[in-house]
């Protein structure tokens, strides 16, 4: 009997050893050891984030966002697949990180000593602060002592720790932590006048202002703090070391700067009147032209084409400038003839020709310019001509920059209006500063359309879910009554 028992124990030990050899990550996931090895064995990197217009979102059925693109590049360097895990708030994110169910938390997370004690942290790659947001045209408090109504925050214990410290200075400070709504949803409720104040990340407030200009910033709650990725706490530093090397390389190669330009560059510019007018136009004018933008988009995103048209004419088919350009895409007579259209004020002809002209400009660019950046170069040419774009690229090279990099060329565009520079260029003087602002505006307008529709879709999804829940509750009540 004793021999049988020993044989059973031995067999079980061999079985567990075999399972561990075949599926080692099943054990490693739930320990603090060999986390980097577990990722390699699993073949995928689990990154937790929050769905919003900066960190992560779905656009045209593909994943986008600052944190997504940076995480994808990191996964590529590790030689593994990327799998994004989406959470509603930071506490859900940190809870899963603490359980080792994700490998990284990446959602523009501000540094906090409490979190630094609980987790490993990656290198700083940006900065932000906590701000008090209120609704424009309401009384603006000067400090926390002036706040007389409810302050709302999302589920964020680190922020609560900060507020508890501030409470020593402002004893009357009270806040409400909403565990049901995301930070973005709280800001949207604030914009609609449903709640009076929200404390949120400065990056998220600036992003939401692009589609909800009613939002205003009262003051900073904290000084700017570094933004980091957080990793599970572990005696092993392999993953943290790999992340440090990756971030250093991302800084050196310009990847970080390019992502900041792509996702954060446009949100630094905010004009209440312009944004309010634009959002009204998106709601009331764009729907009548969006089918045409979609029809003639070609290889472009139709929302970019729409943004170009708004920058050109504010979606006015009869627009005319003193220089003779006309129509919703503001085409010159020569461009109209080149694109073979007869009536520049006909919206369909104008949009078709404008799109074809943009595609033609893109085709004239050297192949050395990356696909994703080619449109920005083409827009400069659309605004001030292909010759001046050639000059801007040549000037960038002369000044030691990369003529194929949009960030490098962009900063030199204003120099086309300075005599010491344009006098040495083939095509001479150009209002390069206007071309610079032209592209910036279009990027901002496009992102606003994307995020306006994203918010609308999310609200529709939430409304449908609430309706289904209400119907289910009614059915349960009816069953109980029967």
Swiss-Prot record:
Keywords: Cell outer membrane, Cell wall biogenesis/degradation, Lyase, Membrane, Signal
Basic and acidic residues composition-biased segments: 473-482
PROSITE patterns, per the entry: TRANSGLYCOSYLASE (PS00922)
Topology of this chain in the membrane: Peripheral membrane protein
Signal sequence extent: 1-18
A GO biological-process term: peptidoglycan catabolic process
Pfam families: SBP_bac_3, SLT
Reaction(s) catalysed by this chain's protein: Exolytic cleavage of the (1->4)-beta-glycosidic linkage between N-acetylmuramic acid (MurNAc) and N-acetylglucosamine (GlcNAc) residues in peptidoglycan, from either the reducing or the non-reducing ends of the peptidoglycan chains, with concomitant formation of a 1,6-anhydrobond in the MurNAc residue
Region (LT domain) location: 268-482
CC terms in the record's Gene Ontology section: cell outer membrane
EC class: lyase
TM ranges: none
Main location: membrane
Polar residues compositional bias, start-end: 457-470
Free-text note regarding domains: The N-terminal domain does not have lytic activity and probably modulates enzymatic activity. The C-terminal domain is the catalytic active domain.
Function: Murein-degrading enzyme that degrades murein glycan strands and insoluble, high-molecular weight murein sacculi, with the concomitant formation of a 1,6-anhydromuramoyl product. Lytic transglycosylases (LTs) play an integral role in the metabolism of the peptidoglycan (PG) sacculus. Their lytic action creates space within the PG sacculus to allow for its expansion as well as for the insertion of various structures such as secretion systems and flagella.
Name of the molecule in the record: Membrane-bound lytic murein transglycosylase F
Organism: Haemophilus influenzae (strain PittGG)
This protein's encoding gene: mltF
């Amino acid at each position: 009997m004793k021999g049988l028992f020993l044989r059973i124990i031995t067999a079980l030990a061999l079985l567990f050893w075999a399972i561990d050899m075949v599926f080692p990550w099943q054990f490693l996931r739930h320990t603090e050891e060999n986390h980097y090895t577990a990722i390699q064995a699993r073949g995928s990197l689990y990154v937790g984030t929050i769905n919003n217009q900066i960190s992560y979102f779905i656009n045209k059925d593909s994943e986008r966002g600052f944190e997504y693109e940076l995480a994808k590049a990191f996964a590529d360097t590790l030689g593994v697949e990327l799998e994004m895990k989406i959470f509603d708030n930071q506490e859900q994110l940190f809870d899963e990180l603490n359980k080792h169910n994700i490998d990284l938390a990446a959602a523009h997370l501000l540094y906090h000593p409490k979190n630094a004690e609980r987790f490993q942290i990656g290198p700083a790659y940006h900065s932000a602060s906590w701000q008090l947001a209120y609704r424009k045209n309401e009384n603006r408090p000067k400090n926390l002592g002036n706040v007389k109504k409810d302050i709302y925050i999302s589920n964020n214990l680190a922020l609560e720790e900060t507020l508890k410290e501030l409470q020593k200075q402002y004893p009357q400070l009270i806040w409400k932590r909403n565990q049901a709504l995301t930070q973005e949803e709280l800001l949207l409720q604030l914009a609609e006048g449903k709640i009076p104040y929200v404390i949120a990340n400065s990056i998220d407030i600036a992003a939401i202002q692009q589609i909800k200009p009613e939002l205003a910033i009262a003051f900073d709650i904290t000084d700017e703090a570094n933004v980091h990725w957080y990793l599970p706490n572990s005696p092993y530093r392999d993953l943290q070391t790999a992340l440090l090397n990756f971030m250093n390389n991302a800084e050196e190669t310009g990847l970080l700067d390019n992502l900041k330009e792509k996702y954060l560059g446009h949100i630094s510019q905010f004009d209440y009147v312009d944004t309010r007018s634009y959002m009204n136009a998106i709601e009331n004018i764009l729907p009548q032209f969006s089918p045409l933008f979609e029809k003639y988009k070609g290889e472009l995103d139709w929302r970019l084409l729409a943004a170009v048209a708004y920058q050109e004419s504010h979606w006015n088919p009869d627009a005319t400038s003193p220089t003779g350009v006309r129509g919703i895409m503001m085409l010159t007579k020569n461009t109209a003839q080149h694109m073979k259209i007869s009536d520049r004020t006909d919206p369909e002809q104008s949009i078709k020709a404008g799109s074809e002209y943009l595609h033609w400009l893109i085709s004239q660019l050297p192949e050395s310019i990356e696909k994703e950046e080619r449109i920005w170069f083409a827009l400069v040419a659309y605004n001030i001509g292909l010759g001046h774009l050639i000059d801007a690229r040549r000037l960038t090279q002369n000044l030691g920059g990369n003529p194929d990099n949009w960030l490098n060329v962009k900063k030199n565009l204003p120099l086309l209006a300075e005599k010491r520079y344009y006098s040495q260029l083939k095509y001479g003087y150009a209002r390069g500063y206007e071309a610079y602002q032209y592209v910036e505006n279009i990027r901002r307008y496009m992102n606003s359309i994307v995020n306006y529709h994203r918010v609308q879709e999310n609200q529709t999804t939430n409304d449908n879910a609430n309706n289904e829940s209400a119907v289910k509750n009614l059915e349960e009540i009816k069953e109980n009554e029967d």
